[in-house]
Swiss-Prot record:
pH dependence: Optimum pH is 9.4. Active from pH 7 to pH 11.
Protein's name in the database: L-arabinitol 4-dehydrogenase
Annotated binding of Zn(2+) 2, by residue: C109, C112, C115, C123
Native source organism of the sequence: Penicillium rubens (strain ATCC 28089 / DSM 1075 / NRRL 1951 / Wisconsin 54-1255) (Penicillium chrysogenum)
Any one GO molecular function term: nucleotide binding
Keyword Nucleotide-binding: yes
CDD domains, per database record: sorbitol_DH
Family named by the database record: Belongs to the zinc-containing alcohol dehydrogenase family.
Reactions the enzyme catalyzes: L-arabinitol + NAD(+) = L-xylulose + NADH + H(+)
Length: 385
């Protein structure tokens, strides 16, 4: 087994059913890595250099569950990661020590019907990192199947950690059937909404209108894509009233009458019932509302609006077969996600990172946790590390 010597203690970021958040020792230990213990066939050991905090990480911490996925014990968070290969099992031939990789955070069975038909995101036996009871990637070192470690070449680890949320939006673009010139609504200007904006712009959608309740996030969207049109959602307005404002914004302030252009597609990135309903009332006859955001178990939606307007309501679950494309898009400059990382912290300061990510007043878009203060300083200075 090929391996590098490690000297730092492996620590991880944990939560539990009591909603505590703390840093503690994790596995594999530095001693095990140096002794070549614990690495299974087909696996590599990775030093995790950057990990983004996802809204689901904050939700597992604060709420203890997402639907049926429940935190039942001490649980390591994090699933948006990139790092460097430290050790390689003898049967792994396509990776070597020192390779820079992004970690696709799933382990599938390769035996069920979804796996055998190429839709492995539906694997009935999947172990998805950071989804209870499977520990996540917010650790200094982690063992992971080599087949789910994608080479990123000279891409920064910061960009490598953005490949996971980019994969979410690429799955949405593909499944939704977005085409060149399609008028588009994006509801929610959080990280997924903003990455959807960049992805949809690259895919040729126009015009695009994006909504949010936060004026600052809409301004951020405008700084990313100056031609995007924005609509600030006012709390208390009905879905129909919001739809009128959205259509007016899509038409550059020229009104929302019967002849106004309506979105052919809405990418719903909030999972909030009122936002889903606003999207349903906004799209054209024969349009589609594609739900990316994760919401509550049950919602009330305007069924007859969907029925009489032949509006399709469609969803996605994670992603599959998207990572190679995501890597190419970033490497070739088609999509630039670098501006979305607004805050960076070392692993030792991960608790502060979570406080920043969970507080709307900080203005954070994407918070990343890096393996060392040196990495934080390099990334903040715009240096590739």
């Amino acid at each position: 087994m090929a391996s590098a010597t490690v000297t730092k203690t492996n620590i991880g970021v944990y939560t539990n059913p009591k909603h505590d958040l703390w840093i503690a020792d994790s596995s594999p230990t530095a001693e095990d890595i140096n002794a070549g213990k614990g690495l299974k066939a087909g696996e590599v050991t990775i030093e995790v250099r950057s990990t983004g905090i996802c809204g689901s990480d904050v939700h597992f911490w604060h709420a203890g569950c997402i639907g049926p996925m429940i935190v039942t014990g001490d649980h390591v968070l994090g699933h948006e990661s990139a790092g460097q290969v430290l050790a390689v099992a003898p049967d792994v031939t396509h990776l070597k020590v020192g390779d820079r990789v992004a970690v696709e955070p799933n382990v599938i069975c390769n035996a069920c019907e979804p796996c055998l038909t190429g839709r492995y995101n539906g694997c009935v036996n999947v172990a998805f990192l950071s989804t209870p009871p499977v520990d996540g990637l917010l650790r200094r070192y982690v063992n992971h199947p080599a087949v789910w470690c994608h080479k990123i070449g000279d891409m920064s680890y910061e960009d490598g950690a953005m490949l996971e949320p980019l994969s979410v939006t690429l799955a949405a673009i593909e499944r939704s059937g977005l085409r060149l010139g399609d008028p588009l609504l994006i509801t929610g200007a959080g990280p997924i909404g903003l990455i959807s904006l960049l992805s949809a712009r690259a895919a040729g959608a126009c015009p695009i209108v994006i909504t949010d309740i936060d004026e600052g996030r809409l301004a951020f969207a405008k700084s990313l894509v100056p031609e995007v049109r924005t609509y600030k959602v006012e709390i208390g307005k009905s879905a129909e009233e919001c739809a009128d404002g959205i259509i007016n914004a899509l038409n550059d302030g020229q009104g929302s009458g019967p002849d106004a252009l309506r979105p052919k597609l809405a990418l719903e990135c909030t999972g909030v019932e009122s936002s889903v309903n606003s999207a349903i009332w906004s799209v054209k006859f024969g349009g589609k509302v594609f739900v990316i955001g994760v919401g509550k178990n049950e919602m009330t939606i305007p069924f007859m609006r969907l029925s009489t307007q032949e509006i399709d309501l469609q969803y996605q679950y994670r992603y599959c077969n998207t990572w190679p494309r995501a890597i190419r898009l970033i490497q070739n400059g088609v999509i630039d996600l670098s501006k979305l990382v607004t805050h960076r912290y070392s692993l030792e300061n991960a608790l502060q990172a979570f406080e920043t990510a969970s507080n709307p007043k900080t203005g954070a878009i994407k918070v990343q946790i890096m393996s060392s203060e040196e990495d934080v300083k390099a990334a903040t200075a715009g240096q590739k590390y």
